[in-house]
Amino acid sequence: DYAAMDAVCTFLLFQKFENALVKNDRLYGVYKDILLPACRFLTDIQDIGVPFDKERLQTSSVLMQTQIDEAIEKLYTYPAIKEFEHNQGKDFNPNSTMQLRGLLFDFLGLKPTGKKTGTGAHSTDAEVLKELAEHHEVPQLVLDIRQKVKIKSTYLDKIYPQLDRDSRLRTGFNLHGTTSGRLSSSGKMNMQQIPRDNPIVKGCIKAAPGKKIVAMDLTTAEVYCAAVLANDKALMEVFQSGGNFHSNIAKIVLANDKALMGVFESGGNFHSSIAKIVFNLPCEADEVAEKFSTQRQMAKAVTFGIMYGAGPKKISEQVTKDSGEYFSMRQASEVIKDYFEQFHGLKKWLDDNKRFIQDNGFIYSHFGRKRRLPNVFSEDKGIASHEVRSGINFLVQSIASDVNLIGAVQAHNKIQEAGYADKMRIFALVHDSVLAEVDEDLIDTYQFILRACIQEDRGISIPNCPIGCDFDIGDDYSFGKFEKKYG
């Protein structure tokens, strides 16, 4: 009776909300053209499941436990821990937040970051430990242990008993789990939160014999979408000119910097060159990615901060925080000024949408999704500014996500129509990536189908320059990184 009533109530709610939706063409279009087809698609890929290697899962769990034991042993041999235990008269337990708080802030005298728990105590979460690790080794050791324990307990140990007889994990994907419209994942495993820094979990997602894991990632998708939305001719020409996008951007933005231009004329990369200048790195630009990857990532933060409408203060704070080196508001202001002097259309688009959000408290995406932003009316300027930035983020993130989702749905349908359902199986969408298990002799065909569907013109394309698709192919989802690290 309960199950039957659940279905009845759901249908009644459907009738109620459908009547409301049809009155708004944009929202009804999202429902009819995106959500309904995507719902059927996600049902299919959830049934397909994520392919795992049981033997590798077991081996990986043992490997991770060994690493945990080694990390704990290293922590306990550290002089500060021994002194703390002697003073306390008991063993130190890194899982005890009370003991950890006493060790870090009282015994070691590290300055609290200002972040507090719900009870008002100083926080010792991952963000805090990362910041404290800049001043002492112990927080990094504790963070390392926590991360390894989480990988083992949340993924390696939890996945194995939940696998079906065919060694596949059937988890969930949600169309309604985020405010940006991106997919979320829940159930047996959250596919959106698989560790990126450690390949051990990805390495356990393994194709069956005769098949390969194929991952398609959109390249520079959000910048691409912003260029089209803003109708910024100069920014679109950067894509149309081919070559390295970020290098081309730098050639335009920093055209008056003769020293920097010399780097680009010899094949430099935008983010690497920016990092070399901003952080005064003792190497050539083409060596930055290998020797100073962190600084290069910080340089990227400047570029994307500009695109999302972050001001000098926000960019200065973010780069300073992430890099550990002071990046002044003056430096941030100069970069923003140079950027917008070249890309007038992007600046106008950002300004127009900021005003619309501030006036209305909502914004629509290109495909018709509506993001409600009531906090723009907050009397707290910080909260209001953050809400505006969230709206700008939504405009580009939701479109890139929808391009990926719509393309994947279309590709899945074409694959079934062509009779390849058992030979090309999309099993997950992770951020802006489409994952599939494909027969080795049909990989080229699969790439052709998916690329054509992703790059189809849906009113968000640059003429003669479709959005970029990068493909990775391998026996497992780590694409060789698992074997390289663990043998």
Label every PLM stretch briefly:
Residues 159-164, 202, 215, 236-239, ...:
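Short, contiguous acidic/charged loop-to-helix segments that flank catalytic cores in large enzymes
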Residues 418-470:
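C-terminal structured "cap/appendage" subdomains that terminate the fold
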Residues 172-284:
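Function-dense linear segments that define catalytic or interfacial modules
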Residues 1-5, 25-34, 219, 240-244, ...:
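Structural motif
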Residues 1-200, 210-212, 219-222, 252, ...:
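Conserved "right-hand" nucleotidyltransferase catalytic core of DNA-directed polymerases
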Residues 47, 170-171, 175-176, 250, ...:
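Conserved catalytic core of nucleic-acid polymerases
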Residues 239, 332-335, 461-472:
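Interdomain boundary/hinge elements
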Residues 46, 50, 62-65, 69, ...:
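Hydrophobic alpha-helix feature that most strongly marks membrane-spanning transmembrane helices
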